[in-house]
A protein has these predicted regions:
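Internal, well-folded beta-alpha domain core
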Residues: 89-254, 258-260
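Short hydrophobic beta-strand segments
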Residues: 2-6, 157-160
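Active-site helix-to-loop segments that bind/position phosphate- or nucleotide-bearing substrates
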Residues: 4-91
Length: 260
């Protein structure tokens, strides 16, 4: 079993805490992407990133100075988005962290596919960015099926906790022999319909990854047992390869986890 999650835009380097234990598998490809970014003008980079002036200036400085072999932070500890806050890697004990190191994989537009303790530097490049790289029209074309092939070498079952942006690049090209199990987190809207809410899904995916790490397994019974504080498994809405979790109704006098 491998668990796939998305990266986060917010990244904070911390090379002085936990040392990386491995380097990204697709480091040469990342170096090529970096060289491609360095060929862009400041205005072209801002258009590519769709960032404000302050973020653009910060990331231009990164592009101009970054070294993919120095001042590295383990990937799991470098990302600081909502999903990673709810996963809470810095609070994990050794056994759950070791379990994640083996079973968790992080999709990345820049690095391709990362293990939790691969050493990385902060970057800004989403998988959906329209970056032409050599003869490839965008990053989906650039990565092609190589990320799927790398994942298929490791496992015959993938738990999909990634956003569609990354599952499209990594899971869609998988061979039919690899089983993909998707977790869906639904909330009830005021009109009674069920829908995914991006912020809540990020929270739930992070909590799910932590739950599995602390359990030390990701078998069907463990997946169904996940409640994640605000979630409960919905067997009547689920299928073998599509596990649905519903947001629990708020108790009287308390606020919901998220308001529509």
């Amino acid at each position: 079993m491998r668990i796939l999650i998305s990266p986060a835009k917010q990244m904070i380097p911390d090379p002085d805490s936990l040392a990386p234990v491995s380097q990204p598998r697709f480091l040469p490809e990342a170096q090529l992407l970096l060289e491609t970014l360095r060929q862009k003008s400041d205005r072209e980079l801002q258009s590519l990133w769709k960032t404000n002036d302050a973020l653009t200036a910060e990331n231009i400085q990164r592009v101009r100075t970054m070294d993919l072999t120095r001042n590295l932070t383990p990937a799991l500890f470098c990302y600081h988005g909502i999903q990673y806050q709810y996963l809470g890697p810095s609070a994990l004990e050794d056994a759950p962290l070791a379990w994640l190191s083996e079973h968790l994989r992080i999709g990345s537009g820049f690095y391709g596919l990362l293990r939790p303790l691969d050493g990385i530097v902060p970057y800004r490049l989403e998988m959906q960015a329209r970056l032409r790289v050599e003869d490839s029209r965008d990053l989906y074309a650039f990565w092609g099926d190589r990320l799927a092939r790398a994942l298929a070498e490791e496992t015959d079952t993938v738990l999909d906790l990634a956003s569609r942006e990354y599952s499209r690049a990594i899971l869609d090209p998988l061979p039919a022999s690899v089983r993909v199990i998707r977790c869906v987190f639904l909330s009830r809207k005021p009109d009674g319909t069920l829908a995914e809410k991006a912020t809540l899904c990020k929270m739930a995916r992070g909590r799910m990854a932590r739950f599995l790490a602390e359990a030390g397994q990701a078998d069907p019974d463990t997946l169904r047992a996940f409640d994640g504080i605000h979630w409960e498994y919905a067997p009547n809405l689920s299928e073998p390869d599509r596990l649905v979790y519903l947001e629990k109704p708020s108790r009287p006098g308390t606020r919901p986890a998220f308001e529509w």
